[in-house]
Amino acid sequence: PFTYAGTIEAYKLTSAMVTTEEYAQQNKYAHSLFVADYAVTHTISWGGLNDEGLIFGKNYASGGVDYTLRAPSVGSNYTGSGNSERGVPQSNEWDTMLNKDSGYIQNWNEMYSWGQDTVSVDASLRAIRGYTSARYWSSTTATNSYPDVGFRPVLEVLNSDTLGSGGL
């Protein structure tokens, strides 16, 4: 199942890159997201997910609604610690959803979730979130696959403006 996070103002990526503040500000936009309640699979590398088109987006349709199924943006680095920890840039989708409602991202305990972002200090690393708290940011290499690192997709609603008031 997925939780509807509503409309958020955040950036997403379309290819592997380090996300700069400038890029995030120029590319953030309002979009409606659902976020998976769990990691739908684990023990799969970022590279393996990317090979299947699942990091930056795959078209998906259900109930007459068109979506892009993909990983969320999570930040290329982090700032703060504990409950004040955030991915940087802070206009990433993961933190933007949590800023709206801390309950939107569930079942993070002892499970990391892959994000889209390349880590700013090492291009071989990819950002992951979760495990010790919903806000926790960490990283691992794009080729690693571990049982505690999973794929928690988001569904981006593509035609929300044509759905009408009862569409979602």
Regions found by a protein language model. Give the residues of each.
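Short N-terminal edge-element motif at the start of the domain
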Residues: 1-30
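Short, surface-exposed beta-edge/turn micro-motifs
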Residues: 30-32, 149
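"Short basic amphipathic alpha-helical interaction patches in structured regions
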Residues: 47-54
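Surface-exposed charge patches in extracellular/virion surface proteins
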Residues: 8-12, 28, 58, 100, ...
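C-terminal, surface-exposed recognition/capping segments
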Residues: 2, 20-23, 38-42, 54, ...
